[in-house]
């Protein structure tokens, strides 16, 4: 059975990639899957879909259904194809439920965001933590539904031929049609490739496992769509499935794949090289390198520095048997011990490591983090001194949660979690064992962090974008402050069109450090409450990043030591820097320029269907209630 998956958007060493989940080219092996609860699915019919759901959140279900129909209209303009029967979508309320699906055999890893079957053409996916993620995964998977429909049903191409289509073509096309050419995250990858003088040819993409197909495939299709027009995409894709990519390129463009590879490379160089400053300041890294591929792995992510600044906990594939949680000296990088491991700890089915980080207790003696165990996320707290488990706690109805933060008085742990497809901020009291829901609204609230004085919680949210009636397919992620005593949320009016994430308070609670792509790059910023001012602290050509754009990549100690994950050479390296080490530059709160986020070429020389539609996603006419009915 040929299937396609989305959202694990990052290259990691091949062994780990297979171990975690990369189902686009893989077969499932038919393992028996443990089910922890029975789900009572209903069926909602829309003009072009049958949505199998058990979600009780009617507003979320309505929005999902409307998005599915909008994606259908947008993809139909590109594929020029119509579904004669309603396409099935199986929707899970959260990722832990999705991992237990019986619609597919075999294990689904924490990194698989969605699956589309070739033969049944079913889309199987969960509601994601962020509204924009759910929308993107749905759009991505529906591209696969169109791909399979147009190849297998309309053109009668054999499943074997479809399976031979290069993965970078299949997945890259799904990324381009669901994200477009404005993507700061993929642009970071392309700048890294240019800087490393390692821009692959199409032959390299096809034959080597070195280049992650989602990112490079998206960049390739952006080039094709921008240079030759989006009307070229489907003919090239269909010809590739029929004749192979070399013959398809020659048939479509009149020259060979080597020539097209050269043209694509020249476009990348011409776009990004002028952005590289002559003084090399953008590749001079601030701080001390503490964790890299010499003392750990290639993927060293989710750093969390202890409040006293002595230790850093992080996730790494150091031992090549999967992702483990390690403890290191925050000053020297010396690995002290492995805190816990999925292999050695039978209570851990998986670490919630891709877009989540753990939290230290105020006394730096305990560490809390999110795991996947027995069909749901649970909070595990360990004693750092000896690695023993202090507690393991399920959060009742909050079956998916992550990005923990420990209150300065030591009594509460706050986190972002999902209930009925809605992402909010919660807190858990360690004494009373009670869960308090801090936010409760349609907005996606994500990655909270306590202020050291215990008065505020900062988090990321799409509330400002939704309140301002954003019409793009992508919803910008802005910063918000929760006043604990007043129980009020206030938006910070900083870089409104950017994604502003991973916010952390300074030790005096007067500043917030955060990551932003406000200029198309991914750098560290500091916001000051008193002056309502923003300083840019880094100016890197690649960027500070985790596995995905939404992954935690910075952590701040009680002494304002900042540990961050720097992306270069397709690897993640941890640095530790004092605040005084950064060269701060004052910039305007509204100062944005996304040229560096645009995948090349900058201009569209052909018919621009995809990006125009993505920029006007919410201007498409929405289906009304009369077009939706529950039939079972």
Question: How would you describe each model-predicted region?
Answer:
Residues 586-632:
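Outer-membrane beta-barrel initiation region
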Residues 51, 75, 168-183, 191-257:
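Active-site-proximal alpha-helical
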Residues 335-342, 390-394, 436-439, 490-493, ...:
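Beta-propeller fold detector
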Residues 295-298, 315-326, 343-353, 368-380, ...:
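A flexible loop/linker signature enriched in serine peptidases of the S9 family
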Residues 26-166, 184-185:
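Juxtacatalytic substrate-recognition/specificity segment
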Residues 303-311, 358-366, 403-412, 448-456, ...:
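Blade-terminus and WD-like Trp-Asp/Gly-His loop motifs, strongest in beta-propeller folds
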Residues 32-35, 41-43, 208, 235-238, ...:
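Beta/coil-rich, acidic/histidine-enriched accessory regions frequently appended to metallopeptidases
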């Amino acid at each position: 059975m040929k299937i396609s998956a989305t959202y694990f958007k990052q290259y990691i060493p091949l062994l780990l990639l297979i171990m975690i989940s990369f189902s686009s080219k893989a077969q499932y092996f038919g393992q028996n899957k443990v089910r922890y609860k029975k789900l009572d699915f209903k069926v909602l019919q829309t003009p072009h879909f049958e949505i199998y759901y058990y979600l009780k959140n009617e507003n979320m279900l309505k929005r999902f259904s409307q998005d599915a129909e909008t994606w259908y209209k947008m993809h139909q303009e590109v594929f020029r194809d119509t579904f004669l029967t309603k396409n099935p979508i199986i929707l899970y309320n959260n990722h832990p439920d999705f991992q237990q699906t019986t619609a597919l055999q075999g294990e689904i890893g924490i990194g698989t965001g969605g699956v589309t079957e070739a033969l049944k053409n079913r889309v199987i996916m969960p509601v994601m933590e962020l509204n924009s993620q759910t929308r993107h995964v749905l759009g991505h998977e529906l591209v696969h539904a169109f791909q399979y429909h147009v190849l297998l049903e309309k053109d009668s191409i054999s499943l074997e031929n479809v399976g031979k289509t290069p993965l970078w073509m299949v997945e890259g096309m799904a990324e381009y049609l669901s994200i477009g050419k404005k993507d700061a995250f993929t642009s970071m990858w392309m700048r890294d490739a240019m800087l490393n003088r390692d821009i692959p040819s199409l032959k390299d993409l096809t034959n080597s496992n070195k280049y992650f197909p989602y990112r490079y495939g998206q960049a390739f299709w952006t080039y094709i769509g921008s240079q030759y027009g989006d009307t070229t995409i489907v003919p090239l894709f269909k010809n590739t499935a029929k004749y192979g990519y070399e013959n398809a390129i020659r048939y479509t463009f009149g020259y060979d794949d080597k020539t097209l590879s050269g043209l694509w490379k020249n476009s990348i160089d011409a776009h990004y090289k002028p952005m590289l400053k002559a003084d090399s300041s953008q590749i001079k890294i601030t701080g001390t390198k503490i964790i890299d591929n010499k003392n750990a792995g290639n993927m060293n992510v989710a750093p969390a520095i202890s409040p006293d600044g002595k230790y850093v906990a992080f996730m790494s594939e150091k031992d090549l048997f999967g992702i483990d949680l390690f403890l290191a000296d925050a000053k020297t990088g010396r690995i002290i011990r492995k805190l816990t491991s999925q292999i050695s700890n039978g209570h851990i089915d998986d670490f919630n490591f891709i877009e989540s980080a753990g939290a230290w207790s105020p006394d730096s003696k305990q560490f809390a983090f999110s795991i996947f165990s027995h069909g749901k996320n649970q909070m595990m707290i360990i004693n750092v001194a000896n690695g023993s488990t202090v507690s393991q706690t399920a959060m009742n109805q909050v079956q998916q949660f992550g990005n923990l933060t420990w209150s300065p008085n030591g009594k509460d742990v706050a986190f972002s979690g999902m209930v009925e497809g809605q992402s909010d901020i919660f807190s858990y009291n360690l004494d009373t064992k009670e869960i308090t829901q801090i936010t409760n609204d349609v907005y996606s609230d994500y990655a909270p962090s306590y202020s050291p004085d215990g008065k505020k919680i900062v988090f990321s949210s799409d509330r400002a974008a939704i309140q301002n009636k954003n019409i793009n397919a992508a919803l910008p992620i802005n910063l918000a402050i929760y006043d604990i005593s007043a129980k009020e949320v206030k938006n910070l009016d900083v870089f409104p069109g950017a994604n502003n994430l991973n916010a952390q308070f300074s030790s005096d609670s007067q500043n917030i450090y955060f990551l932003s792509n406000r200029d198309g790059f991914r750098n560290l910023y500091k916001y000051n409450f008193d002056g309502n001012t923003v300083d840019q602290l880094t100016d890197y050509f690649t960027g500070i990043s985790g596995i995905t754009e939404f992954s935690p990549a910075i952590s701040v100690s009680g002494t304002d030591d900042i540990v961050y994950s720097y992306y270069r050479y397709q690897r993640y390296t941890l640095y530790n820097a004092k605040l005084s080490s950064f060269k701060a530059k004052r910039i305007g709160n509204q100062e944005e320029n996304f040229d560096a986020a645009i995948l090349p070429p900058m201009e569209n020389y052909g018919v621009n269907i995809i990006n125009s539609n993505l920029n006007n996603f919410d201007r498409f006419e929405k289906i009304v209630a009369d077009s939706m009915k529950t039939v079972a």
